[in-house]
């Protein structure tokens, strides 16, 4: 429990005709705080795993509608929900192999259900962000089926087709270059019908579109317009920095590495110098309707690359915090580095978990060998919602959900079945398990058999149970998000690491012209004493929140005094009174 080292002070109480691609927009200097997505919190829903209403064991759009109040103003207080892909798909990459970008997969419901979801969400002040998979399609997409059938048809040049670079002595055609697949193995697949290779960064059933073909760009932007016309408020762009490849498809340089993918410098198959021009054209489409946003998923890149591709009002995911261990030195370094790289002119994102990575409750506690997973998850919630940038909260994190051990025969993640001595992979099924709504059979997720097994701890890690407990992780998230919404410094303030913070405490201030907020995390399972720093605004700090004691609030402490913090505790304080 958070406490002073002496007795505390008293409490005080869509579809449009094809059109020419627009010219690049002029990137204007951002005014941080002008837009909802800078101040707000975005909640990622994995539709298969959120709530099932028809008993088939797979989540659906009606299930999301039924639980909007959980994420809305009366619940978490989320500003927007991001839906992982809801489009028709053969399901070989669990929805990221899209066969039609313009409609809803019947597995999840109908177009009417989607329109009702938009309407019901908007009525609650919740915006809708769609996942756009535009780097590649399914090999069952009509575009690819037409493209593979003919070298001369209207879709012949829509994908990355190339002739072989030669032939082996036995006559086997050789790939055009040395590019490989992120999922292991070669990146080029031979198509007998065309007598050519096509490229795929991921599965062979996910052929890459040729974004340098103007017809591809026009079709994609038409699709974007269609979803905007249906009321969508934003887009998450899957692996967006891989859209453009080198015009000549040059081979990548080699380097030392632990897998075929890591043994290449990916200079020519992503991050092309004219990529920002393409994104500017995309942003022109989105910006035609006020209040819309987009966030790009940086595919296998650095924080410097993320900052470089963040311009104007565009967000880009960076993975620095998502990959950092629960270690004070590592967290201090990561927080300071990402803020310095983005600087004052670019707006970052913050994410600790998603559908491709271990849940942060499991990952962070394991990285420190800390058995108190709940305490680590709660302190990490403070980190997520108080560092500078737009927070993205993955469904179930508000309960402190852990990864679930999935036996290999139950895995629903194709690359996990390809693991060998030259290809390592973490089974993503483990972080995609169903949302537990109650302690009832099947956790209130379905009346049937869930598509993935539930975690063993749903008896306590479920919405109904935690909603009734003031000290639960869910209650903490509700308080945290409400506090953030009422505290401009936590939304749009500058970030300054606290100099002199050492040992196990990671501390930083968030400041606006009118407000100064101090955040401190004890990144250790051991108790610690920590001296509160001075503030140019005040000689006192008022406690706003403690992860160790839901009742602790309004205690005032003088700058320079020491406080005691429990293991894995985080506190938020505000400067009060004259300096």
Give a label for each model feature.
Residues 90-95, 305-310, 509-510:
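Short glycine-biased active-site loop of nucleotidyltransferases that positions the nucleotide triphosphate
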Residues 11-14, 36-38, 248, 253-270, ...:
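Loop/helix patches that line or flank the sugar-binding groove of alpha-linked glycan CAZymes
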Residues 534-550:
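Solvent-exposed beta-hairpin/edge-strand motifs
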Residues 27-30, 300-304, 332-339:
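Alpha-helical scaffolding within the catalytic cores
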Residues 2, 11-14, 18-225, 229, ...:
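Acidic/aromatic-lined carbohydrate-recognition and catalytic surfaces
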């Amino acid at each position: 429990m958070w406490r002073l080292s002496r007795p505390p002070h008293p409490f005080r109480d869509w579809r449009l005709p094809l059109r020419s691609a627009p010219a690049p927009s002029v990137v204007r200097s951002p005014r941080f705080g002008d837009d909802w997505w800078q101040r707000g919190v975005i909640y990622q829903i994995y539709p298969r795993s959120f709530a099932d209403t028809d008993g088939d064991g797979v989540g659906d759009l009606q299930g999301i509608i039924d639980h909007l109040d959980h994420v809305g103003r009366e619940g978490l207080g989320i500003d927007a929900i991001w839906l992982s892909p809801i489009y028709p798909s053969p399901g070989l990459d669990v929805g990221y192999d899209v066969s039609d970008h313009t409609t809803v997969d019947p597995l999840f419901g109908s177009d009417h259900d989607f329109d009702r979801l938009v309407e019901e969400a908007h009525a609650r002040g919740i915006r809708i962000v769609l996942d756009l998979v535009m780097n590649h399609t399914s090999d069952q997409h009509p575009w690819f089926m037409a493209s593979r059938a003919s070298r001369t048809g209207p879709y012949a040049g829509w994908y990355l087709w190339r002739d072989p670079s030669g032939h082996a002595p036995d006559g086997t055609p050789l790939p055009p270059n040395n590019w490989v697949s992120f999922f292991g193995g070669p990146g080029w697949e031979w198509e007998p019908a065309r007598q050519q290779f096509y490229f795929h960064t991921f599965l062979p059933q996910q052929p890459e579109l040729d974004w340098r073909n103007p017809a591809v760009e026009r079709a994609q932007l038409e699709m974007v317009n269609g979803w905007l016309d249906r009321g969508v408020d934003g887009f998450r762009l899957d692996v967006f920095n891989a859209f453009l490849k080198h015009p000549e498809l040059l081979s990548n340089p080699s380097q030392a590495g632990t897998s075929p993918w890591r043994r290449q410098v990916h200079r020519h198959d992503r991050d092309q110098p004219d990529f920002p021009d393409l994104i500017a054209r995309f942003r022109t489409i989105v910006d035609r309707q006020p209040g819309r946003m987009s966030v790009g998923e940086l595919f296998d890149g650095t924080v410097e690359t993320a900052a470089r591709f963040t311009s104007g009002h565009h967000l880009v995911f960076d993975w620095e915090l998502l990959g950092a261990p629960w270690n004070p030195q590592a967290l201090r370094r990561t927080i300071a580095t990402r803020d310095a790289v983005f600087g004052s002119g670019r707006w970052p994102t913050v994410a600790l978990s998603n559908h491709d990575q271990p849940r942060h409750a499991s990952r962070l506690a394991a990285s420190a060998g800390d058995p108190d997973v709940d305490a680590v998850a709660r302190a990490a919630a403070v980190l997520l919602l108080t560092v500078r940038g737009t927070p993205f909260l993955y469904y179930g994190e508000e309960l402190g959900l852990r990864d679930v051990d999935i036996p290999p025969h139950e895995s629903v993640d194709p690359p996990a079945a390809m693991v060998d001595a030259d290809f390592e992979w973490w089974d993503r099924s483990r972080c995609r398990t169903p949302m537990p709504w109650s302690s009832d059979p099947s956790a209130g997720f379905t009346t049937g058999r869930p598509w993935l097994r539930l975690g063993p701890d749903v008896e306590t890690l479920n919405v109904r149970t935690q909603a009734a407990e003031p000290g639960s992780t869910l209650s903490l998230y509700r308080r945290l998000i409400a506090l953030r919404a009422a505290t401009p410094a936590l939304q749009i303030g500058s970030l300054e690491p606290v100099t002199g913070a050492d040992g196990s405490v990671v501390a930083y201030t968030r400041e606006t012209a009118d407000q100064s907020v101090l955040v401190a995390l004890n990144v250790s399972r051991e108790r610690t004493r920590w001296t509160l720093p001075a503030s140019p605004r005040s000689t006192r700090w008022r406690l706003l929140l403690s992860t160790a004691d839901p009742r602790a609030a309004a205690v005032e402490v003088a700058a320079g005094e020491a406080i005691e913090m429990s293991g894995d505790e985080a506190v938020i304080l505000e400067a009060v009174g004259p300096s």
